[in-house]
Design a protein with these regions (language model features):
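Conserved class I S-adenosyl-L-methionine
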Residues: 2-70
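Conserved SAM-binding loop of SAM-dependent methyltransferases across substrates and taxa
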Residues: 85-96
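Conserved SAM/SAH-binding beta-strand->alpha-helix loop
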Residues: 106
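Conserved SAM-binding loop
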Residues: 113-114
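Conserved SAM-binding strand-loop segment of SAM-dependent methyltransferases
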Residues: 119-130
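A conserved beta-strand element that flanks and buttresses the S-adenosyl-L-methionine
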Residues: 143
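A short glycine-rich, Lys/Arg-flanked "PGG" loop and its adjoining helix->strand segment in the class I
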Residues: 158-172
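Conserved beta-strand signature within the Rossmann-like core of class I S-adenosyl-L-methionine
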Residues: 173-180
């Protein structure tokens, strides 16, 4: 049996939670999304454990770093894969001031996004994101934030296929932005970055120890990174996130 993060397994789980074939579990993304759609109660749905409901500061920092890699500075459209309930999607539409399409396997998550996190620039689609993922639009940039195919495995072939399918949805000069917690405790795409760059024939740039809250007070990437390293030693745990840009 494959691990839960593979697209076909995620779809099975999504259907099971949505159709009440399994016991409700708010620790699971799909269980939380179902509860949130029904109640719009942030606390009782435990949505804060699954989605960043206040992502503005984080996304502004990512945009600031990412902008230098965009050949087309006037972005007309953004793709947000694994968008969940749409909090980040809506904010991205506001800070970029352009159209954005959020895609997630969760029907409940997408329905919540349509109801509560929509504006004139947002579109939401419930669809599985696998090696055959293909929409009818070409996007200028794709955001993949805490996206399971990149955060839960170092399966090189799987990640190559997912990234290839994402780039099939991007314009010729499109950019893929990956943002996730930086940790040495589990296997992630960080194990494969350089090899993926070669296989995909894409340039790649990585930033480690990215921490929006620290950056707010120390608005210099290298100094804020140093602060994260020091805090990590003091606290004996990982501090900060990793930003990976394929372009």
């Amino acid at each position: 049996m494959k691990e839960f993060f593979y697209p076909e397994e995620l779809k099975k789980s999504e259907i099971a939670y949505r159709t009440n074939k399994v016991k409700p579990d708010l620790r699971n993304d799909f269980g939380s999304y179902k509860s949130l759609l029904k109640t719009n109660d942030f606390e009782n749905s435990m949505i804060k454990f699954h989605n960043d409901i206040n992502p503005t500061q984080k996304l502004k920092l990512i945009k600031k770093i990412t902008d230098k890699f965009l050949k087309n500075k006037n972005n007309h459209s953004i793709l947000n894969v694994g968008c969940g309930t749409g909090f980040e999607t809506k904010v991205l539409s506001e800070i970029y001031n352009c159209n954005i399409t959020g895609v997630d396997v969760s029907f409940d998550g997408i329905e919540y996004a349509k109801k509560y996190n929509s504006n004139s620039k947002t579109e939401y689609i419930s669809e599985i994101i696998d090696g055959n993922f293909l929409l009818n639009t070409k996007f200028d940039i794709c955001y993949a934030i805490e996206f399971y195919p990149f955060t839960r495995t170092k399966d090189l072939e799987f990640q190559k296929n997912i990234i290839s399918s994402i780039f099939n949805n991007l314009s010729k000069e499109g950019v893929l932005v990956i943002y996730q917690i930086e940790t040495d405790k589990c296997d992630t795409i960080k194990n494969n970055i350089q090899e993926l760059s070669v296989l995909l024939k894409k340039n790649v740039k990585t930033y480690s120890k990215v921490h929006p809250k620290i950056y707010k007070y120390i608005p210099n990437y290298f100094l804020s990174k140093l602060c994260c390293l020091v805090l990590g030693k003091i606290l004996n745990r990982d501090v900060g996130c990793q930003l990976i840009i394929f372009y």
